Amino acid sequence: MRIDPFKLAHWMNARKYTAAQTADLAGLPLDDLRRLLGDEANEPDPAAATALAEALSVEPSQLAADAHRNLTVVHKSAEEMHASRRPIQRDGIHFYNYYTLAAPEGRVAPVVLDILCPSDRLPALNNGHLEPAITVNLGPGDINGRWGEEITPQTWRVLHANHGGDRWITGDSYVEPSYCPHSYSLAGDAPARIVSYTAQSNISPLMTEANNWSTGAFEEALKALSGKVSAGSVLDLFLARRAHTRTSAAEAAGVPPADLEAALRSPASETGLTVLRTLGRALGFDYRVLLPADDQHDGVGKTWTTIEDSRRSRRTFGTYEAASMASAAHLPDLVGSFLRVDADGRGADLIDHAENHYVVTEGRLTLEWDGPDGPASVELEPDGSAWTGPFVRHRWHGTGTVLKFGSGAHLGYQDWLELTNTFEPAATLRRGRRDLAGWGYDN
């Protein structure tokens, strides 16, 4: 296992150990530790790596080097995508074929599905998954979607394919929440496919943490979150952690208790915002967490965008023509666009604050990007795909269509909230990136 020198330095600082103390605790020569701090390619024997982890009270994996450093773009040809095909059996029939699109190893990747369940059969539901998703009909046929045991207008709907002259907008799309059971069948005799953009879930770290909690602790958490998370329930948790009641908190903030109760009933009102902001300043918490989400979903959690909705969203973006897929304010990191490319020369630069996943649906397109060793490019045809990292400058040219998806896997809205609270954010990031500075007491 290669040791990441920056992770090693971070944990030495976090544990408040000097290099000499760390080496002594791990039973390593000090010069060996210094070599690990200075050389990313240095790979200690397993016993030394384990000893270092034990000395710093961490798991060895918390010191392991990542394989993704300096990664800018990952791409996959149509042939490579087709080679990833795996047939799925469900309900006694060949139900789907799955194909994986480009993504770095160890990260969530979008998939394309051949829909094979015939139209005269009710498609058997799956169990849902943690990752929310944007699902888009790629055509050429329509698709039946199912989202519940009982068939209702909310649990059964057709995802239409675009049969018009603007087929670069491939079809209907919808946003699907975590753990929503779903399934699809053909809506006629025409074949059909979907792309399922399963994005990284922002609550995935919480679920990983909760897996290690005791059953009693987890049940207490569920009590606090029962029903719809509200300003009052969250505030009560914040106050208990600070040894406050609503009465004492209101007194500390100079707010009448009745005004606080009114603010919790209507947190987004002008008075509610003023009261909660005053309370946050007095007690030291971010009042924005208490504001209600702007939910945009039906009774099973879906948010739908029809072909006509996408057509109405058409606009020029640099050298591209764009149209929107389904989106929802309560899942702000989950984004998707249809992108029409028609540029013989260099296309307009694209540079996003989070990862992008692309899949080509028509034409032969060239993706160019600024790599760590200079300009790079790849030519992709339909079913070719690519992943671009955050803040990687890239562009498309040629004539065709590419579907553009994004998630919050890198710099998501939670990160932006944190950065708005960070003193000198640029300086903090500059210092923290690849930081090998000791904590100041080695000498």
Curated annotation (Swiss-Prot):
Cofactor(s) recorded in Swiss-Prot or TrEMBL: Fe(2+)
Pathway stated in the Swiss-Prot or TrEMBL entry: Secondary metabolite biosynthesis; bialaphos biosynthesis
SMART domains reported in the protein's UniProt record: HTH_XRE
Effect of K16A: Abolishes 2-hydroxyethylphosphonate dioxygenase activity
Record: residues binding substrate: K16, Y98, N126, E176, H182, S196
Record: residues binding Fe cation: H129, H182
Keyword Iron: yes
GO BP field: antibiotic biosynthetic process; organic phosphonate biosynthetic process; phosphinothricin biosynthetic process
Enzyme class: oxidoreductase
Molecular function GO terms recorded: DNA binding; ferrous iron binding; identical protein binding; oxidoreductase activity, acting on single donors with incorporation of molecular oxygen, incorporation of two atoms of oxygen; protein homodimerization activity
Lineage start: Bacteria, Bacillati, Actinomycetota, Actinomycetes, Kitasatosporales
Family, similarity comment: Belongs to the non-heme iron-dependent dioxygenase family.
SUPFAM superfamilies to which the protein is assigned, alphabetical: RmlC-like cupins
Subunit annotation: Homodimer.
Residue intervals of the HTH cro/C1-type domain: 8-63, 234-290
Function recorded in the entry: Non-heme-dependent dioxygenase that catalyzes the conversion of 2-hydroxyethylphosphonate (HEP) to hydroxymethylphosphonate (HMP) in the biosynthesis of phosphinothricin tripeptide (PTT), also known as bialaphos (BA), a natural-product antibiotic and potent herbicide. PTT contains the unusual amino acid phosphinothricin attached to 2 alanine residues. Synthetic phosphinothricin (glufosinate) is a key component of commercial herbicides.
The protein, known as: 2-hydroxyethylphosphonate dioxygenase
Reactions it catalyzes: 2-hydroxyethylphosphonate + O2 = hydroxymethylphosphonate + formate + H(+)
Keyword terms of this UniProt record: Antibiotic biosynthesis, Dioxygenase, DNA-binding, Iron, Metal-binding, Oxidoreductase, Repeat
Note: Mediates the cleavage of the carbon-carbon bond of 2-hydroxyethylphosphonate (HEP) to produce hydroxymethylphosphonate (HMP) and formate without input of electrons or use of any organic cofactors. Reaction was initially supposed to follow a Criegee rearrangement with a phosphorus-based migrating group. However, it was laster shown that it is not the case. Phosphinothricin tripeptide (PTT) herbicide and fosfomycin antibiotic biosynthesis pathways share early steps starting with phosphoenolpyruvate before the pathways diverge after formation of 2-hydroxyethylphosphonate (HEP). HepD is involved in phosphinothricin tripeptide (PTT) herbicide biosynthesis after divergence of the 2 pathways.
EC number assigned by the record: 1.13.11.72
Annotated cofactor note: Binds 1 Fe(2+) ion per subunit.
Organism field: Streptomyces viridochromogenes (strain DSM 40736 / JCM 4977 / BCRC 1201 / Tue 494)
DNA-binding region: 19-38, 245-265
